[in-house]
Each structure stands twice: as C-alpha cells, then as structure tokens.
Regions:
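Second-shell loop/turn segments in exported
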Residues: 43-54, 119-126, 148-154, 183-184
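Metal-dependent phosphoesterase signature
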Residues: 104-129
C-alpha cells in the first residue's frame, strides 16, 4: 500500500514539475522574443536622432499646412472632391501623437507580450507626447483646421485617451466626434472607412502616422514587405508633401508583413522568420 502511495505521489510530483517547467519555458520564450526589441525601444526612448527626426517631420508638416491652406485644390486624399468643404487634417494617435514606449519597456522587463497590459496602460493616461506633435497640432488648430484622430485604440479607451491628450495640452474638438476609435460604429482596424467619413465634409489637407495603414486601405497595407514598399513608391509625391511618416521601429505592420500577418506563430517560429528575413551581403 505504501509503495503504491509513494508511486502515486512521485507521479504527481513529476507532473507538477513538468507543468511548471513547461510554463517557465513558455515564459522564457516570450521574454527572449521581447528582449530582441531592447535596442528598438532604447532607440525610440533615448536617441537624439529619433528626436531630430520627429521634430523635423512635424516642422515639415507645419510648412506643408500653410501651402495647403493657400491652395483650395489641395487634398491629401487621392481623387477627393474638395469643392465647398471645410479643412481638416487626419492623424494617428499611438507613436504619432502619444508615445507608448514606456509600455514597450514594461513588456521587455516583465517578459510579457501585447496585448497583455495594453488596456491597463491606456487607462493610466500616462503616455507622453511624441516630440513636435503638440506644437504642430496647436498650430493647425489656431488656423481653424479641424483635427481628426483616427486610431486603432479600442473604444474602451476613448475617455482615457481624451484625458491623456488634455493632460499634455494636445488639442481635440470637444464639440464634435473627432476621435474615431476601433470598435465604434462597427469600424475595424482598416482606417479607410473612417477616412472616407471625414472626406464627406472636409478637405483633408494632410495626414500623419507611423504605419502605412495610416495612409492607405488595408488591402494595400496587409501585403508582403516588397509589395508594401512598392505602394510607398507609388505614392512617392505624397511623402513629405501631404503624408508625413513618423519613425516607429518598435512595432507595426512592417513586422506583421514578415509573418504574412499570421499572429498565431510560436515564439520559435517568429524568431526563425526574423532570422530568415535578414538580407546579408557577403
């Protein structure tokens, strides 16, 4: 009897140890994968070069805004009918206006992965300003231009986002719906329908974002890296004139494109795909 009892206890102990070991290995895989992002997040948070790039982008956008206001035929939306319309700009929020690199740093240090902790982070209302964003947006507002924020933050974060913007002195119109969130009105992550909604009443003078999908519809964004580059080249005349891209080397659809937008890959598969995507010249 004692022998059978000890045998049972031994088996249970082995199973528990195996399960704990498996969980620890899984957490280690996630941690190792996130640690590959350390240099990216450090660049976003500490590099003088990133600061210069961001200030440069918004300074260029400010000059472009003056040109756009002086030209009644100007539009940042290809083929838009601009007759008798009010003026507006469209900007993304995350990594365009609000800097969430503190959340990225947390994930690295805690060994977690998105979307773990994302909603909680948003509700802290602690994101900082992307350098140059506030100055540019206040300038646009002073010119009577309506600012539309088209973001893929979930609608649950709407109030927290509004508070975060207000804390930073970033303008948003409280008299109309100008912060358009994912999940509102059946909007999905494709921002095209929201841009089209704005275009019904407004002449869109320029757009700013950190992701190709902030400028083009999903069918042109959710492609291979090579095809996404071809789309960028197709709109070469828009960049720096009507469309303004902010640097974000920490995350984005540029990474999803490496995996063919298959987010069910294991950490090992993600790591291997990253390695295979490198292009050395020897």
């Amino acid at each position: 009897m004692k022998a059978r009892l000890w045998q049972t206890l031994f088996l249970l102990n082995t199973l528990i140890i195996s399960e704990v070991s498996f969980a620890e290995d899984a957490n280690k895989d996630v941690r190792d994968l996130k640690e590959q992002n350390i240099m990216s997040v450090l660049y976003q948070q500490t590099a003088a070069e990133r600061l210069a790039s961001s200030l440069q982008t918004f300074s260029s956008a400010k000059r472009a805004l003056d040109i756009a206001l002086a030209d009644p035929s100007w539009s940042a939306l290809p083929g838009q009918n601009v007759k008798d319309k009010k003026t507006a700009i469209i900007v993304d929020i995350d990594e365009t206006v609000l800097d969430n690199t503190a959340y990225e740093a947390r994930m690295i240090l805690d060994g977690t992965k998105y979307p773990q902790g994302w909603v909680s982070w948003g509700k802290e209302e602690a994101a900082t300003e992307v350098p140059g964003a506030k100055d540019f947006l206040n300038y646009a507002s002073s010119k009577g231009v309506t600012i539309f924020y088209i973001t893929n933050r979930v609608v649950e974060l709407k109030e927290a986002t509004q508070i975060n913007l207000t804390k930073l002195g970033i303008p948003w119109d409280k008299t109309k719906e100008t912060i358009l969130m994912r999940g509102e009105n059946n909007w999905d992550s494709d921002k095209g329908s929201r841009r089209a909604l704005v275009a019904q009443e407004y002449r869109v003078l320029l757009m700013a974002g950190d992701n190709l999908g902030d400028f083009v519809d999903a069918k042109y964004n959710n492609l291979s890296p090579q095809k996404r580059k071809a789309i960028v080249e197709e709109y070469a005349d828009y960049w720096g004139e009507k469309w303004f891209m902010l640097q974000n080397i920490a995350y984005g659809d540029w990474e999803g494109a490496l995996y063919d937008f298959n987010y069910s890959l294991s950490p090992d598969e993600v790591h291997n795909t990253r390695i295979e995507s490198l292009e050395p010249i020897r």
